């Protein structure tokens, strides 16, 4: 495998990453300035230190042949699973989630770095399992995905756990799985959320107990619905096996998704905390709880709207400096940027991310081996999901899940994860035939 020279180093990816990180540091600093112009937070200094260390990590990974991860991915992935278990048992709580380990003020979020281990291991499995039956291979890939997701969800950290799903879907698409399988997973996830949240939606927005609420409140009714759906699905399976008719297949396909989704929702209402479920629906109308669950979205939309075309000027945003906006250096950093730099600033950030995404697609199109292509697709899925959900959350069109905007939001673990992932892209791009 040929490594190209310094003249062919991926400067475009490096400069894009540095531009986004620099913008992030600017607005982390802005978030730490109060209404009197005094700096009350030193988060920006920590972010600068983490950024410098992250660049070193990124360049180190870029110089390492990504093929050499193949024989080590099982050990790396197993190590992170053990670390996630350790975090669940002995970690410390930060923002309501037991997701950090460390000593004193120094701590790391293992679930962030586990994304990289997961991408490497899933890519390795999908490459070396191509001779296995399709459904068996897809099911095993699903189990590999559910393992870290379940451990992270138990912390409970819904936002970080949810990132693994789009990574899985994008990598399975690149691996060549039929669209019907990928579509089925998407439908099951959406239906599970629907069945889980529908009773709360009735109570919060309609303010009465409808059919969904009455079924959810009765364990007997819930089990009856589940077993009825499962039995009907089983009958459809038997009909398809005996007759071979196509419509039995599609009935089984549809009813199977509904049955699995409803069964998963029965577990979901016991796993998700009440505040997590409220966050998932409050974006539909934050005014129903403007001082609690809806406060973040309302203040974020005010900040973005007040920025106008050119913004109110750097360090001149009242929403952030008067501390109206919670989590403004992390989850809602895009709101500060839009308030102070306006629509133009938002377009600049959008353009930089678009450049990152298109360049990653270009790398994928030129990679000769499936392993490298799968790793790049996993990185793309991770970055794209973070971007869409975080920006959509600040605009009030996506639920609040606590997902940071990679490279911009404050936080060493997420920043290092993003930079290590960028280093993997550089390593792949530098070793094309």
Curated annotation (Swiss-Prot):
Record's keyword annotation contains Transferase: yes
Source species, domain of life: Bacteria
Gene Ontology cellular component list: cell division site; plasma membrane
Cellular compartments annotated: Cell inner membrane
Protein's membrane topology: Multi-pass membrane protein
Record pathway: Cell wall biogenesis; peptidoglycan biosynthesis
Known EC number: 2.4.99.28
Pfam families, sorted: FTSW_RODA_SPOVE
Alphabetized GO MF terms: lipid-linked peptidoglycan transporter activity; peptidoglycan glycosyltransferase activity
Gene Ontology annotations of biological process type: cell division; cell wall organization; peptidoglycan biosynthetic process; regulation of cell shape
Swiss-Prot/TrEMBL keywords: Cell inner membrane, Cell membrane, Cell shape, Cell wall biogenesis/degradation, Glycosyltransferase, Membrane, Peptidoglycan synthesis, Transferase, Transmembrane, Transmembrane helix
Keyword presence, Nucleotide-binding: no
InterPro entries: Cell_cycle_FtsW-rel_CS, FtsW/RodA, RodA/MrdB
Transmembrane segments: 9-29, 44-64, 74-94, 100-120, 158-178, 181-201, 221-241, 249-269, 295-315, 341-361, 378-398, 400-420
Reaction equations catalysed: [GlcNAc-(1->4)-Mur2Ac(oyl-L-Ala-gamma-D-Glu-L-Lys-D-Ala-D-Ala)](n)-di-trans,octa-cis-undecaprenyl diphosphate + beta-D-GlcNAc-(1->4)-Mur2Ac(oyl-L-Ala-gamma-D-Glu-L-Lys-D-Ala-D-Ala)-di-trans,octa-cis-undecaprenyl diphosphate = [GlcNAc-(1->4)-Mur2Ac(oyl-L-Ala-gamma-D-Glu-L-Lys-D-Ala-D-Ala)](n+1)-di-trans,octa-cis-undecaprenyl diphosphate + di-trans,octa-cis-undecaprenyl diphosphate + H(+)
Protein function: Peptidoglycan polymerase that is essential for cell wall elongation.
Entry's family note: Belongs to the SEDS family. MrdB/RodA subfamily.
NCBIfam families: RodA_shape, rodA_shape
Protein name: Peptidoglycan glycosyltransferase RodA
Organism: Treponema pallidum (strain Nichols)
